[in-house]
């Protein structure tokens, strides 16, 4: 779309032969070159890493949509814009709050590990499968 944004989709041919997941990605540095490999279906990007560039670390904000590329972009724009370290800290706090809702007593450390791992797996993908605009 522009020199910091890429949109597209991934076409899965496994469990659902026509399943597409659309995405929008915005990068912190400018994309100066790109190449799409038709054989592997991969996009290769080269970023501006000059001294004038914002940062040596390139951050990406990514959103997905089951509807279309515009839906992915709307989803991206509707979310709070955090730096990576901010998002990591916020999500660590959210996970800690969620996982601490249940506590077990009288279990061995191994049993606790199994329990909390299973609980984590139950909570890892509570997805709302619609775009921010309700589609």
Predicted regions and their residues:
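Acidic/polar, glycine-enriched structural segments that form the non-catalytic walls/loops
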Residues: 1-135
């Amino acid at each position: 779309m522009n020199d910091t944004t890429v949109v597209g989709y991934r076409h899965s041919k496994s469990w659902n032969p026509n399943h597409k997941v659309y995405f929008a990605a915005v990068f912190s540095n400018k994309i100066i070159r790109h190449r799409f490999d038709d054989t592997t279906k991969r996009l290769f990007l080269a970023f501006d890493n000059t001294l004038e560039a914002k940062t040596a670390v390139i951050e990406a904000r990514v959103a997905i949509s089951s509807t279309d590329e515009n839906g992915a972009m709307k989803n991206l724009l509707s979310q709070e814009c955090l730096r990576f370290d901010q998002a990591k800290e916020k999500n660590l706090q959210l996970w800690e709050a969620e996982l601490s809702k249940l506590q077990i007593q009288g279990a061995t450390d191994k049993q606790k590990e199994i329990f909390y791992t299973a609980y984590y797996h139950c909570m890892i993908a509570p997805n709302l499968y619609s775009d921010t605009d309700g589609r």
